[in-house]
Amino acid sequence: MPLTFHIYPPYTSTRPYSIISLFTNKRPPLNYTPQQSRFLLKTSLVTSAGAAYCWYRSYTGIAIIDGIAVLTSINYWRDPRYDWRRTMDIWWIYGCLTYHLLRAYKSQYYIGYYAITCFACSLYPFSHYYYNRGKYWNSVYLHSGLHVLANIANIVLYSGYIPPIWENPVVGFLVGV
C-alpha cells in the first residue's frame, strides 16, 4: 500500500461542510478529543514564550506577529473543528512561517534556525499520516513536537542579529527596489 498524505482530516459524514454551514446550526465534528486538544493547546502556547523573548530583544514587529499566532492557535485549539477558525489559524501560521523564513535570511543564526525549522516542518505530514489512520495520540505527539521545535527555532533566530526586512533581497525584488 503506497504512502498517501491527506491535507485535511476525513469527514465523519458523507456531506462536506461548506460556507452554507456557517449560517446553520450544523457544526463540523471535533477533530480531536478534549484531552488531545488541551494537550495541543498547551504546546501551542510555547509561542508566547518566544514572542516575549522576541519583544525583549526589541524585534517588536516579529513579536506582534507571533502574538497574533498565539491568539489564532488558542481560538482553534479550544474547540478544534474543521471550520473557519482552523482555516484562519493555518493561513496565519503559513504567513508567519514565510515571514520568519524571509527574516532569517542573512541573520546571525540562520543555519540553526533553518535546520531546526526543516526538522519541525517534517513532522507535519507524519502527523497527518497517523491522524488519517486513526492513531490520534501519535498524531497529537508529532504535531506537538512541531509546535515545540518550531518555537525553539524561533528562539534561536531571535537570539542573534536579524537584519531589517527591507535589506532582504527577496523583499527588495518583490517591491521593486
Regions found by a protein language model. Name each.
Residues P2-V177:
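Multi-pass alpha-helical transmembrane bundles in non-GPCR membrane proteins
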